[in-house]
Amino acid sequence: MLLKQIFLPFFVLFNAINAIDIYQNQVSRGTIDLSIGAITIHSGAYWSIIDNAISALVGTLTVQQDAGFYITGLNPLLGLQVELLGVLNSIKNDGIVSFNGLNSLVGPIYNLVGLSFQNNGEFYLSASGVAPPVFSITAADWHNNGLLVLAQAKRTSALANLGFPTGSIENQGSICLFGTAYQQLTSITGSGCISADRDSTIYIFSSLLPIATTQTLYLADRASSIVIQPVTLPATYTVRGFGNGNKVGISLPLLSVPLLGQPAYSYDPSSGVLTLRGLGVGLLSQRFQIGTGYDSSLLEIVTDDGAGLPTTLLGSVRYNGPVPNNAVPASCNCKYVPPSPGTDESSSLSSSTSEQSSSSATSVSASETSDTSSTQESSLSSEVSSTQEPSSSTPEPSSSSETSSTQESSSTEGPSSSTDSSTEASSSESSTAPSSSAEASSSTESSTEEPSSSTEGPSSSQESSSSEESSTQEPSSSTKESSSTEGPSSTEESSSTEGPSSSTDSSTDITSASSTDEQSSSGTGQSSTEDEPIDSTESDTSSATDSSTATDSSATNTDTNSESTDSSTATDTSSTDSNTASSTETNTDVTDSSTDSNTGATESSTATDTNTDATDSSTVSETGATDSSTATDTNTGATESSTDSNTGATDSSTATDTNTSATNTDTNTGSNTATNTDDNTATDTSSTETNTATNTDGTETNTGTTETNTDTSASNTDDNTGSNTATNTGGTDTNTDTNTGGTDTNTGTNTGGTDTKTGTNTATGTNTGATETNTATNTNGNGTNTNTGATDTATNTATGTNTNTGATDTNTNTNTGATVTNTATNTGDVSATKDIPSPTSTDEGSNNGGGSNNGSGSNNGSGNGSGSGSGSGNGSGDGSNNGSGNGSDNGSGSGNGSDNGSGSGSGSDNGSGSGSGSGSGSGNGSGSGSDNGSGSGNGSGSGSGSGSGSDNGSGSGSNNGSGNGSGNGSGSGSDNGSGNGSGSGSGSGSGNGSGNGSGSGSGSGSGNGSGSNNNNGSGSGSGSGNGQDNGIITSSIGQPGSSTSTQGPSSSNSATIPEQANSGNHIKFTLFNGLLIGLVPIVFM
């Protein structure tokens, strides 16, 4: 208390310094800061704030008698937020306070928390109901002596809160609910009225907080209800207006248990009390004093499933008869939300603007029509005034704000997509008045209509502009009659617009025969309330010169495309081009796009078949001396991807050229032969066929196109009588893609321009004669195309059949003349047989082959690299000191040394004495036997082990170990043998084999060579040689022959055995090594 006494003077002083006082009418728009102190609206004045998103009141709000304070949101995307959060602030209203969010698509927040709330005037909180709002007026000291309205245009799950929870409020006036559920959280005193109207609910949440029986709960319509939670002892509530199907109930099911409980409900006709018993138990019952005169047989148990309420199955009772006493209680004086100052003025302004535009036939700009959005709220409020209760003392002024702003578009050249959006907010009248050239004036008057308001019938008289092909167009006038109870609706008139508009393609070609379009359209808007017809007749003498199409010197060819039925009655003024072509493009199945992509054969298949669901937009427009016959037959559909992806060795060449539709016969029966040869002058540049139709003295010869169009200047016969075969010769695209050879990946995507056949068939015919505009837009095939030119007979009697029956479009992609880029990526293994010349050794792969014919090249060791050649398999060759490989110091295995046997030779007369151990020494060959391999026979044995030693060759020399030196490749070295060393041990020698390559070739030679110093030694190495550039070194040194090597995935390196391998030093060194190795066993025996 002491703190309050200290703080309160400072607070009052602060508010007095920063107070806002309004003495005269004021309208503020846009953002404004209200958090500056107390606000007082003095008598005779109002303050209307429009489109201020956040209004934070930090001081006391006082509205005096005959004053008003309004906060309104006209912008539908703006959510109002009005807050009073000062605990010492208060609200006192003796005039009108209205927080109006009926136009907002965002739920407004009205959170008024203060020390006290006293309403002696009218207080309105409203929302559109698109999103749940917040209705909360919380104060410890809460009094309503006037009118408090909580309104939603559409009910949501939001629950209104009045007073401080568990506290008390006094209601001596009227609390009126429109489309709103009120949740009682306080006790209620006073003798006022709480009215539920337009699908509203009074929800008594806690009967622990009593409601005085002098407080009347009124059900104003059949959709409203009362629900009480029966958690305490039964109480009695005064209810009026019960009947016509509205409901009273509790939050427990109304059941009657036979023999145990009481009936679910009972009505006492003498006292007028209706008792509802939850679960048939008396303690869970509530009593409703509904009045006398009710018939119990008309009572029925139902379920109240209103939004925001706990759904209780069979918890309510309705009365299926009229209210016996239908008088509205005297304390229930309800009104709907009034219009806010500053909004009704804008609505009347826009209404007068649209009315003026409808009478003077001027084109209302978009800025004027956009101003109609500001009238929605006012017209909505005026609508509610027409439906208020009969006993309302103050009828709401119905500001005739039904602003149907009339768009009258004067004749507009070119595409005019002017959207005549006449927004009418009062009732949901969607007046769609398209202008004659399909000016889509969808004036969607999306008003938020409260229930039981007068509905305006949307009489949208659409003015179908079927523009006749004569030189003078007179569209029929459209009469829009909207029977509205709101006010005078303005006249909508849309004058006929020349040129293509957004929806109807009425392209009128105005030529030198001056066509005068005189649209005399009179629109009559009639108001059912005023009973005062408003006629305004406009004669729009707009000679709309549509210079959008051809300026024909003597012909006026007007093609009118009304929706999809291409009536195209192109009446040429002096040239009689009567195109009787019914051009029946029958797409019986899929609309085949026939996109043949041929790289090379540029298939300028001009005759572009537009088979888009049989929409042959064959706009053959011969403008001036330019016969721009854009017969756009665009076979859109079946895209024929022609993938041709041959992956692997399979030549999968799928050349998908799928043309899975009909045969694309393109028969176009007419003399319009259009033999689409590859010599087609119609240069299909990026699918644009220039169809040069040279009209020399009337003979329009479409060279290369699907259209001959024989136009003669004087009597321009243009005789399209025939079959319009459109044979597409040259673009046949068989695309057989015979990938002869390897894997032939043939990823040939036929990149020839996708051949979408969108060739626009421009047909630039020179047509030196009369100018035939022939805009034949054959939609669905029945285009009449009567071009009455100079004498320009142009008898296109073609049935232009374009019969894409099933769209099979075989289109085999023959690629005749096309360059198929067969990319042929050989992904798999390829086995190739190669003839290797005599002095060349091919070192390929890691697989070792055996040289069967071992040449006796001089001093060549053909052994391989670092693998040790401990051939355990011994060559059983005999003969003393015979190498099976001949030549001076040649090894036959992979290269021979001098006197070396290619296999493992035996020592002095030893057979297969191959050392089982791997030959040691730096670079060892796996040879065995001193005095190697037997005589004249060949030691063809190959050691099974791989030759050891770094960089060893497998060559055998006479009396050599397999001694390979370090650093030997598997090539040929001088004086090396890849042969085998001495008999029983593995021969070691420092002699080097000339074999290069780090791979080792270890052949164990089991074959015996006999004979003295022959040039054979067919040692074959069975081991694998690996290392640098490993592989079988096949040397055809001795006998030239062909060696077949199996090639793996690795690269092939051709190693040429050098001629320098025959040097004398190597021969000597090899002989010395052989003798040394042969003597070692003798010494140690």
UniProtKB/Swiss-Prot annotation:
<feature type="compositionally biased region" description="Gly residues">
    <location>
        <begin position="1018"/>
        <end position="1028"/>
    </location>
</feature>
<feature type="region of interest" description="Disordered">
    <location>
        <begin position="339"/>
        <end position="1060"/>
    </location>
</feature>
<feature type="glycosylation site" description="N-linked (GlcNAc...) asparagine">
    <location>
        <position position="980"/>
    </location>
</feature>
<feature type="glycosylation site" description="N-linked (GlcNAc...) asparagine">
    <location>
        <position position="992"/>
    </location>
</feature>
<feature type="lipid moiety-binding region" description="GPI-anchor amidated asparagine">
    <location>
        <position position="1062"/>
    </location>
</feature>
<feature type="glycosylation site" description="N-linked (GlcNAc...) asparagine">
    <location>
        <position position="976"/>
    </location>
</feature>
<feature type="glycosylation site" description="N-linked (GlcNAc...) asparagine">
    <location>
        <position position="960"/>
    </location>
</feature>
<feature type="glycosylation site" description="N-linked (GlcNAc...) asparagine">
    <location>
        <position position="910"/>
    </location>
</feature>
<feature type="glycosylation site" description="N-linked (GlcNAc...) asparagine">
    <location>
        <position position="890"/>
    </location>
</feature>
<dbReference type="InterPro" id="IPR021031">
    <property type="entry name" value="Hyphal-reg_cell_wall_N"/>
</dbReference>
<comment type="function">
    <text>GPI-anchored cell wall protein involved in cell wall organization, hyphal growth, as well as in host-fungal interaction and virulence.</text>
</comment>
<feature type="glycosylation site" description="N-linked (GlcNAc...) asparagine">
    <location>
        <position position="896"/>
    </location>
</feature>
<keyword id="KW-0732">Signal</keyword>
<dbReference type="GO" id="GO:0009986">
    <property type="term" value="C:cell surface"/>
</dbReference>
<feature type="glycosylation site" description="N-linked (GlcNAc...) asparagine">
    <location>
        <position position="854"/>
    </location>
</feature>
<feature type="glycosylation site" description="N-linked (GlcNAc...) asparagine">
    <location>
        <position position="932"/>
    </location>
</feature>
<feature type="glycosylation site" description="N-linked (GlcNAc...) asparagine">
    <location>
        <position position="860"/>
    </location>
</feature>
<feature type="glycosylation site" description="N-linked (GlcNAc...) asparagine">
    <location>
        <position position="964"/>
    </location>
</feature>
<feature type="compositionally biased region" description="Low complexity">
    <location>
        <begin position="539"/>
        <end position="828"/>
    </location>
</feature>
<keyword id="KW-0134">Cell wall</keyword>
<feature type="compositionally biased region" description="Acidic residues">
    <location>
        <begin position="529"/>
        <end position="538"/>
    </location>
</feature>
<feature type="compositionally biased region" description="Gly residues">
    <location>
        <begin position="847"/>
        <end position="1010"/>
    </location>
</feature>
<dbReference type="GO" id="GO:0009277">
    <property type="term" value="C:fungal-type cell wall"/>
</dbReference>
<dbReference type="GO" id="GO:0005576">
    <property type="term" value="C:extracellular region"/>
</dbReference>
<feature type="glycosylation site" description="N-linked (GlcNAc...) asparagine">
    <location>
        <position position="1016"/>
    </location>
</feature>
<keyword id="KW-0325">Glycoprotein</keyword>
<feature type="glycosylation site" description="N-linked (GlcNAc...) asparagine">
    <location>
        <position position="924"/>
    </location>
</feature>
<feature type="glycosylation site" description="N-linked (GlcNAc...) asparagine">
    <location>
        <position position="864"/>
    </location>
</feature>
<protein>
    <recommendedName>
        <fullName>Cell wall protein IFF6</fullName>
    </recommendedName>
</protein>
<feature type="glycosylation site" description="N-linked (GlcNAc...) asparagine">
    <location>
        <position position="782"/>
    </location>
</feature>
<feature type="compositionally biased region" description="Low complexity">
    <location>
        <begin position="342"/>
        <end position="528"/>
    </location>
</feature>
<feature type="glycosylation site" description="N-linked (GlcNAc...) asparagine">
    <location>
        <position position="968"/>
    </location>
</feature>
<feature type="glycosylation site" description="N-linked (GlcNAc...) asparagine">
    <location>
        <position position="886"/>
    </location>
</feature>
<feature type="glycosylation site" description="N-linked (GlcNAc...) asparagine">
    <location>
        <position position="882"/>
    </location>
</feature>
<keyword id="KW-0964">Secreted</keyword>
<feature type="glycosylation site" description="N-linked (GlcNAc...) asparagine">
    <location>
        <position position="874"/>
    </location>
</feature>
<keyword id="KW-0843">Virulence</keyword>
<feature type="glycosylation site" description="N-linked (GlcNAc...) asparagine">
    <location>
        <position position="952"/>
    </location>
</feature>
<keyword id="KW-0336">GPI-anchor</keyword>
<feature type="glycosylation site" description="N-linked (GlcNAc...) asparagine">
    <location>
        <position position="659"/>
    </location>
</feature>
<feature type="glycosylation site" description="N-linked (GlcNAc...) asparagine">
    <location>
        <position position="996"/>
    </location>
</feature>
<dbReference type="GO" id="GO:0098552">
    <property type="term" value="C:side of membrane"/>
</dbReference>
